[in-house]
Curated annotation (Swiss-Prot):
It is found in: Spore membrane; Vacuole membrane. It comes from the Eukaryota. Acts as a suppressor component of the dual wtf meiotic drive system, and can suppress but not confer meiotic drive by compatible poisons. Wtf meiotic drive systems promote unequal transmission of alleles from the parental zygote to progeny spores by encoding a poison and an antidote from the same locus; the poison is trans-acting and forms toxic aggregates in all spores within an ascus, wherease the antidote is spore-specific and targets aggregates for degradation by the vacuole. This is Meiotic drive suppressor wtf21. Disulfide bonds: none annotated. Homomer. Interacts with other proteins that exhibit high sequence similarity. The chain crosses the membrane at residues 73-95, 110-132, 165-182, 192-214, 290-312. One of its GO terms (cellular component) is vacuolar membrane. Residues 19-30 have a biased composition (Basic and acidic residues). Its main location: membrane.
Length: 329
C-alpha cells in the first residue's frame, strides 16, 4: 500500500525556509561545518550546547582580578592602630599636663609602662585579627545611636514649647535658691547681678533651647525679651532717679525688694508674652485706655461742675423785676 503524503506547506512557506537557512545570524556569526558522523555531536548553536557550555563570564575572562572583597592587611592594621594611637595621645597629654611624663620614673613606673606597651600590642593584634567583627559592631552601634539621636531630636522639636517652659521654671528655682543663699549671707554677690537675674535666666534659656526652637521662634523670643528688658530698665531708671534726686539711696533691704520685684515681674511678663503673644502691647493699650477713661471721667465731672456753676451764676444775674413776672406767671 502506497503512502500518499501531501505537504501542507504552501510554496511561499518553503521559500521562506530556504531564505532563513541561508541567512547568517549577525550575533552568532556564520554556522561552522557540522559533521553528523561524530557521535554525540550537536550543532554549535543548539540549546543543548548552550546549556552544557555556558558563555564565559566577566570574572572568567579576567582571572587575574582578585575575587576577595576584604580590605588589605595594611589598611586593617592602620584602622586597628588608630584607636590605640588616639588613646595614647590622650594619655600623653594628661601626663604632660600633670608634669609626670617620663619624669622621675622608678622601677614601678617602668614596669607599668612596659605592661602598658604589652597591652597596646595585644590590643593591636586582637583588633587586626577580628577586624571585620569589631568594624561591623561599630557600624551597627553608630547607626543605632544616629537613629536614637534622630528620634530624640524629633521629640524635642515637637515639645519645644513645653521644653522652654520647663527650662525656664528650673532656672527660676535656681534663682530662688540663689536669693536664699544671699539672704542667709552664705553667698555674696553684687546687687546689680541680682537685679539682672532675669536677664541672665532669659539668656541661658535662649542658649539652651535654641537647639530645638526654629529660628522664627528664636527671633520672636528675642523681641519679647527686649520688650521686657526695656520695661524693667524704665522702672529701674524711674526708681533710682527719684531716690537720687531726693538725695537718698536704697539700703540692703530696699535693694533686695527692688531685685525681687524686678525678677518676678520680668519672668511673669516674659512668660505671659511667650504664652500670649502681644500681651505687653495689650497691657500697654489697656493701661493707656484705663488712664484715658479715668482722665475722661475726671474731665466730664469737671465739665459738669463748671456747667453747674455757670448755670448758678446765670440765675444770679437775672433782674429782680423779671423774677417777679416769672413768679406771677
Amino acid at each position: 500500500m502506497k503512502n500518499n503524503y501531501t505537504s501542507l506547506k504552501s510554496p511561499l512557506d518553503e521559500e521562506d525556509e530556504l531564505k532563513t537557512d541561508h541567512e547568517i545570524d549577525l550575533e552568532k556569526g556564520p554556522l561552522p561545518e557540522y559533521d553528523s558522523e561524530e557521535e554525540g555531536a550537536l550543532p554549535p548553536y543548539s540549546d543543548h550546547a548552550l546549556v552544557n557550555n555556558p558563555p564565559n563570564t566577566h570574572r572568567e575572562n579576567n582571572p587575574s582580578r582578585s575575587t576577595d572583597n576584604s580590605s588589605p592587611f595594611l589598611i586593617k592594621l592602620l584602622i586597628s592602630f588608630t584607636p590605640i594611637y588616639v588613646l595614647n595621645v590622650l594619655a600623653i597629654c594628661y601626663l604632660t599636663y600633670k608634669d609626670a611624663f617620663f619624669k622621675d620614673y622608678g622601677a614601678a613606673e617602668w614596669t607599668l609602662f612596659g605592661f602598658w606597651c604589652l597591652v597596646c600590642t595585644l590590643a593591636l593584634i586582637f583588633l587586626t585579627y577580628f577586624y571585620e567583627t569589631w568594624v561591623k559592631a561599630v557600624k551597627v552601634t553608630v547607626i543605632s545611636l544616629a537613629k536614637c539621636v534622630k528620634v530624640i531630636s524629633i521629640g524635642l522639636f515637637n515639645i519645644r514649647r513645653e521644653m522652654m517652659i520647663i527650662i525656664w521654671i528650673l532656672w527660676l528655682i535656681i534663682c530662688c535658691i540663689l536669693f536664699v543663699y544671699i539672704k542667709s549671707g552664705d553667698l555674696i554677690l553684687n546687687k546689680a547681678l541680682i537685679c539682672s537675674t532675669c536677664t541672665i535666666s532669659a539668656v541661658l534659656l535662649l542658649i539652651v533651647s535654641s537647639v530645638c526652637i526654629p529660628f522664627w521662634t528664636f527671633e520672636r523670643t528675642l523681641a519679647k525679651l527686649a520688650k521686657v528688658l526695656l520695661l524693667q530698665s524704665g522702672i529701674v531708671l524711674v526708681l533710682n532717679g527719684t531716690m537720687f534726686l531726693r538725695g537718698k539711696h536704697f539700703e540692703r533691704i530696699g535693694c533686695e525688694i527692688e531685685a525681687s520685684v524686678l525678677f518676678i515681674m520680668g519672668n511673669v511678663l516674659f512668660l505671659c508674652e511667650m504664652e500670649c503673644p502681644g500681651a505687653l502691647i495689650r497691657t500697654r493699650n489697656s493701661i493707656r485706655n484705663g488712664i484715658a477713661f479715668i482722665l475722661g471721667g475726671i474731665g466730664n465731672a469737671m465739665m459738669g461742675l463748671a456747667n453747674a456753676i455757670r448755670g448758678a451764676n446765670d440765675n444770679n444775674d437775672i433782674p429782680l423785676g423779671e423774677m417777679d413776672v416769672e413768679s406771677e406767671v
